[in-house]
């Protein structure tokens, strides 16, 4: 996976600890470690070659003893999935599901890089995970998502039909406000609304225009800001897999509509436009 160059550089630094959250990210975590170990072995070979005639037992031992600092820094103490919970009950669950492994991170010294399988709403991160990681007092926290930014409803799987449920969408809306381009949202709304009575085969997904002015990094930075819990001062970064990286990692699974907005059926375009119209009318027309 092409996830994070800075995280990969951490394989050469003794002050970076890698972990995963939640339990469903375990497979992605081991895949990440495999990639890091391959990269580290390549670096070891190059460092040994550079020694040339100056090789000594001590230098060779130092190079060969380099390891990825992999720790199970967080774990679920009860078998619960907060993803499918509703409203306040979800927040209550998220706040109590996880515990940490003390001593796995050197306070104020180590960077903590944790991989998540996906960050959709951001509830678990904000209400639980970041607070728990902050109790370890790392120098910085980097949350790496093995999936790209989930920007659109699925409609073929889990029922999340409201655009405002997605942290990526909320971040894009906030960026419109910050940059003084909120009027774009009304244009998108008018385009979506004009298509409501068209046959689904003629509908274009104009919701994709919500993200057009911003890079993925812009949205990730805004998400990190929005998901920072009150009272947490540790530096926080969120890094997402790219869509290109996803296709490279999973070449035989081309479906990416919840990331790209390219729905496999016309009905998807129609439904996502309806979802944006509902969001806009509830958020702006009622003011």
Where are these regions (language model features)?
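PRPP-associated nucleotide enzymes
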Residues: 1-287
């Amino acid at each position: 996976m092409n996830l994070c160059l800075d995280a990969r550089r951490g394989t050469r630094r003794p002050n970076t600890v890698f972990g995963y959250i939640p339990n469903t990210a375990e497979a992605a975590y081991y895949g990440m470690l495999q990639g890091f170990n391959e990269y580290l072995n390549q670096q070891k070979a190059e460092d040994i070659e550079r020694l040339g005639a100056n090789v000594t037992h001590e230098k060779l031992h130092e190079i060969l003893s380099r390891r990825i600092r992999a720790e199970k820094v967080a774990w679920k103490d009860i078998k619960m999935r907060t993803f499918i919970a509703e409203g306040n009950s979800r927040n209550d669950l998220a706040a109590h599901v996880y515990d940490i492994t003390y001593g796995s991170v050197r306070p104020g010294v180590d960077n903590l890089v944790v991989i998540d399988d996906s960050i959709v709403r951001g509830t678990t991160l904000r209400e639980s995970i970041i607070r728990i990681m902050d109790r370890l007092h790392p120098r910085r926290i980097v949350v790496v998502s093995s999936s790209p930014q989930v920007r659109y409803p699925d409609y073929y799987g889990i029922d999340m039909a409201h655009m405002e449920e997605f942290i990526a969408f909320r971040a894009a809306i906030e960026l419109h406000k910050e940059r003084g381009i909120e009027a774009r949202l009304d244009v998108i709304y008018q385009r979506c609304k004009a298509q409501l009575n068209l046959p689904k085969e003629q509908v274009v997904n104009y919701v994709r225009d919500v993200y057009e002015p911003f890079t993925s990094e812009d949205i990730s930075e805004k998400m990190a800001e929005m998901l920072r819990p009150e009272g947490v001062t540790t530096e926080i970064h969120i890094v997402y897999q790219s869509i290109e990286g996803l296709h490279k990692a999973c070449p035989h699974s081309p479906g990416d509509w919840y990331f790209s907005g390219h729905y496999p059926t016309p009905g998807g375009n129609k439904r996502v436009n309806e979802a944006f119209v509902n969001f806009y009318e509830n958020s702006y027309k009622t003011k």
